Amino acid sequence: MRLDFENAYADVISFDCGTEVKEYHAMIHVAESRLPYAKQLEAVINAYHALLSKWPDTQAVFKRYFLSDAANQADDVIVADVTDCAKSIIQQAPLDGTKIALWVYLMSNVQTSLTKSGLYQVSHGEFRHLYNASAHNLAANSEYQMRLLFNEYIMQLAEEGCTLSENCIRTWLFVNDIDLNYGGVVRARNQVFFTQGLTVHTHFIASTGIGGRQQDPNVLSQMDNYAIAGIRPEQIHYLYAPTHLNRTSDYGVSFERGTYIDYADRRHVFISGTASINNKGEIMFPKDVEKQTRRIWENVEALLKEADCTYDNVVEMVVYLRDVADYEVVRALYEERFPDKPFVIVNAPVCRPGWLVEMECMALKAVNNPDLPMF
């Protein structure tokens, strides 16, 4: 559903399977691109508060701000938004011509707090959902930065009685000048994962590795992540779609194409950043953004199908474009195919230059698994 506010609007999907926790995904956009940044930020923050007043029993559990110029804008977001949740702030310019967009994930009837480890905790029932965002450091290069990020995260998880291999469900890796610095990020992740027992013979973690920068140009790698304390191994399932995609380890990287988590009452599906690839690892339809977009849809559909889901179950999408000149074509395709979905299209180069476009998404489905704990 679309909700209109002063100088902003939100596309929202709510999920209610009849149990205690309702979930909401909202993509908040600025309606008037000619406004100065301060007014655009104000419009987004006011729209967020209007959503909270519409659903007074909800709390934000995760936010991502997409900015057009982090060096000039990020500090203002930090001052304006004092919400007690994980806040991801990244320069990935919204391609509708505005300076800021916000993806916010809300839940009802949960308790939120900041843990001693520095992770944001969302508690309900047996589980503690642990979110972290905008993690960064100033090590010498992208490889050292990413290795330190993962090692610090492993220590944070240990403080929560968790491990990377058993509890981490999703990561986002943002790489400043990805064409130059992605190789270092890949090496660091491969090395850390090997030490943590994450191999081609066990499993990896659903992830997006994408271009994005911070306000400090010396930050070459930023990480957001999500883990679940209390999750059981039998609740976690990995998605492969081998008819459409190959294993990422075939071309030297280490992430899962998708993951779904089952509870007694619902299924959470996390689709990693997905590009126009085939099951040999080749780029499909080089230099044709429309055909690449349609191939992505097909690939994501195949992954969703393995989780017994369709696009009807998708609750949010982020679309990454390498070339701003492709925006009108891609926007028209998405608006025609997904008129009622919360999505945002941002300027962010994909990890391989030949991939012009990439998308990630999350899906939610009501299920009945009486042998599993409730969400």
Q: Model regions: which residues?
A:
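N-terminal presequence-like segments and the immediate start of the first folded domain
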Residues: 1-312, 321-375
